[in-house]
């Protein structure tokens, strides 16, 4: 190694110096200490220079300082012990042997330390390189300068070279120039935590590609900006006319670099959060599915996934066959079955009209089947039997007794008068129930007219009530 030359020079100087100062036993301890310090400083400087060239100036200085400290302490102890154990004549020879053994041991130790330092440096370089490549398993502080993952824990959500291309900050930034996502190194199609590129506001509305409106769409737009109620064609094979997939080949997630955990961002291979890959998927996973549609607020057919792919069933109310869903507020009758290739016939019911009495009367008669409706319609109702008349007459009397607050006398007399007039069939006949005399046109005499045949006598209220009551109360 590079410190072998300075080490040999130091050993030679020590051996020569030790021979001259050998007989002085009183300086044994100080001599050992001085020799140890010299050896320690020399080895430390050599190691500092070698390690500094290997791993850089700052790291080399730190490592060299530690190694110098350790070697200085060990060398002082070893040389001091050897000097104290061999006093008197021949100190130079013994000291030379001891120093030689110590130097050999230190050489082996330095070689081992160098090998371990080289391994550490190599592992550190690999870790640094892996952090910029989105290695899934790395943790630690090697990725704090704008890597592609949350310190490497999720494997680089945006893949190599797509996230934070111009920044050095932490993954929680609000968007660097040139990156509209702003966080996690996502693709320029936007990410859930981004705030829009170049300071743009979050776009929570419909993006220009017909996919889920996510924060981060402030700066990236597609080529076909059709956001109106355009009713795109049913088939999604080949793009379509509106919101049918955006430009092919746009940056829509890394290829094979891991995903966001729940495919909520379209970061796996082949998919996108906005359906921008040609023939891509509707919800982030490769191959196309009707899942979460790139982080939408609902499943397939939700209000926010509006035609997010060019060949899948995301956001299609009518089933598979095209990713052109319907924008809320723009749906028209007949659009429900367009995606599945059907004719789109409106399947709505007729609005109910006015009240139909004929239908109601038919339903009512059907529920009362025990009544002979034909006889009633033909006015062929048989007269009630005597037993029925007596039964209902008794009920009527009980009802009148239970309702004394009604003037039944006036009610019954008025009913009798009307019923008697109908039965007599004479409009010119005058009934006098109060027994008053009316003047006639002949000579001014007063006459009392009697009721016609079938009438009731005004003197008997009981005989007057029953026939009129039964005639007034009808049971059909």
UniProtKB/Swiss-Prot annotation:
Disulfide bonds: none annotated. Residues 153-169, 193-202, 236-259, 268-298, 316-326 have a biased composition (Gly residues). GO terms for biological process: cornified envelope assembly. One of its GO terms (cellular component) is extracellular space. It is found in: Secreted. Residues 299-315 have a biased composition (Low complexity). Coiled coil: none annotated. The keyword Signal applies. Expressed in epidermis; in the spinous and granular layers and in placenta. Also found in the epithelia of the small intestine, macrophages of the lung and endothelial cells of the lung. Isoform 15 is expressed in epidermis and placenta. Isoform 1 is expressed in epidermis. May act as a soluble regulator of keratinocyte differentiation. Belongs to the dermokine family. Homooligomer. Seems to be able to homodimerize and homotrimerize. This is Dermokine. It comes from Homo sapiens (Human). The gene is DMKN.
């Amino acid at each position: 190694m590079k410190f072998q030359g300075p080490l040999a020079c130091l050993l030679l100087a020590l051996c020569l110096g030790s021979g001259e100062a050998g007989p002085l036993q009183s300086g044994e301890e100080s001599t050992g200490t001085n020799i140890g310090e010299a050896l320690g400083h020399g080895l430390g400087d050599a190691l500092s220079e070698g390690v500094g060239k290997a791993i850089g100036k700052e790291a080399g200085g730190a490592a060299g300082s530690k190694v110098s400290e350790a070697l200085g302490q060990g060398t002082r102890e070893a040389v001091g012990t050897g000097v104290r154990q061999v006093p008197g004549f021949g100190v130079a020879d013994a000291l030379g042997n001891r120093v030689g053994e110590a130097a050999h041991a230190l050489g082996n130790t330095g070689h081992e330390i160098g090998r371990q330092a080289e391994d550490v440096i190599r592992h550190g370089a690999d870790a640094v390189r892996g952090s910029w490549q989105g290695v899934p398993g790395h943790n630690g502080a090697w990725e704090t300068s704008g890597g592609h993952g949350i310190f490497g824990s999720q494997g680089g959500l945006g893949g190599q070279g797509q996230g934070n291309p111009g920044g050095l900050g932490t993954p929680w930034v609000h968007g660097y120039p040139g990156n509209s996502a702003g966080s996690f190194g996502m693709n320029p199609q936007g990410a859930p935590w981004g705030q829009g590129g170049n300071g743009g506001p979050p776009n929570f509305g419909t993006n220009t590609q017909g996919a889920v409106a996510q924060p981060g769409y402030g700066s990236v737009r597609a080529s076909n900006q059709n956001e109106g109620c355009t009713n795109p064609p049913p088939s999604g094979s080949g793009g379509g006319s509106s919101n049918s997939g955006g430009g092919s080949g746009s940056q829509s997630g890394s290829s094979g670099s891991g995903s966001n955990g729940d495919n909520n961002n379209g970061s796996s291979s082949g998919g996108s959060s906005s359906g921008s890959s040609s023939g891509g998927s509707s919800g982030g996973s490769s191959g196309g599915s009707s899942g979460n549609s790139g982080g939408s607020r609902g499943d397939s057919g939700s209000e926010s996934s509006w035609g997010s792919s060019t060949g899948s069933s995301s956001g299609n109310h009518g089933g598979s066959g095209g990713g052109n869903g319907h924008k809320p507020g723009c749906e028209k009758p007949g659009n429900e079955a367009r995606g599945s290739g059907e004719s789109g016939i409106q399947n709505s019911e007729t609005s109910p009209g006015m009240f139909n009495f004929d239908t109601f009367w038919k339903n009512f008669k059907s529920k009362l089947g025990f009544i002979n409706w034909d006889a009633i319609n033909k006015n062929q109702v048989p007269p009630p039997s005597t037993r029925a008349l007596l039964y209902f007459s008794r009920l009527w009397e009980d009802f009148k007794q239970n309702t004394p607050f009604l003037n039944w006398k006036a009610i019954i007399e008025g009913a009798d008068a009307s019923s008697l007039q109908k039965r007599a069939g004479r409009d010119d006949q005058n009934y006098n129930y109060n027994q008053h005399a009316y003047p006639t046109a002949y000579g001014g005499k007063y006459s009392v007219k009697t009721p016609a045949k079938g009438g009731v006598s005004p003197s008997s209220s009981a005989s007057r009530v029953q026939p009129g009551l039964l005639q007034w109360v009808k049971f059909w």
